[in-house]
Amino acid sequence: MPGLFDILKIKDVDLRNRIVFAPVVTNFGLRNEQSLLYYAERAKGGAGLIILHATPVDLFLKPEWVRRLKPLIEAVREQGARIAVQLWHGNELNGERVAPSVQGPCLAITREEIQMVVRKFATAALHCRQGGFDGVEIHGAHGYFLNQFFSPLTNQRNDEYGGGVEKRMRMAVELVSAMRREAGEGFLLLYRHSAVDGEPGGTTVAESIQLARALEVQGLDIFDVSAGRGQKDSLSIPESSSLEGTHADLAGRIKAAVSIPVIAVGRVQRRAVADRILQEGKADLIALGRQLLADPFWPEKLRPDKEEDVVLCTYCDVCSREMRAGRPIFCTQNPNLGREKR
């Protein structure tokens, strides 16, 4: 079984280790010095793959917008890491009033609009590749647009995009297929998915396995396993009382059903937990979010066996609270977060 610091080769992309910096919304923006230094610090700290936080897909329809991210991309690459960006499509969570079905203030998206969204993601993937990214991650988790299509709790359509799981996953399948055609091979496509909703009548692991298999057929490279339906959900954002390696068992069930690499996430702080997940074959990659906010050098401190020097996240959730309030995040354990220096 792989070790935490073993290289992972995915097609033409080599990841120097199995550590992923998960996409964490900062409210810093992206095209500025603050974000460049923030992400470069996590790359310098030893993460193998850096995923920039969730960003509206529409921004990446403009090649000039992507080109202005070149300094950030180069800063991460100079530290030896690979870089991707998480793309998402808006819904009522960010004030855009469309959804799979009529709900609250939202109108049901039409078939024509669905195809427009698919084309947007395909174009964005191409522009990201041309702009220097190693890959993109599609945000299909945590109650956002694609998650709403997949979940029976929010998809009440009675056409080819709603009903049984094959229909509810159709949009995701079409989207990944179009992105692969447009971006070509050798460019990483990741999909972040909530494997269970955690509510009666919601998404099941068996359905998530069907999705992972279908996306693999369409050319997906990495399946990123999370859970839950929202920002205030302890499944989506595990708490201090949550199990270490919160979603590892979910990831393991999906990994057993596919051939592509799988990411496990959720309260991984100790080397022993990360090693166990990998050695038990539950995942190929380990994603950390808040722990790498508290200590971006977590990977580098583990490599020489200096785990006692790691600054641990306390899961006080101040960072998430600030994010939800629309303010720049900060960390009670790391006063330098957002104030990184060259």
Predicted regions and their residues:
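Flavin-dependent oxidoreductase catalytic cores
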Residues: 1-342
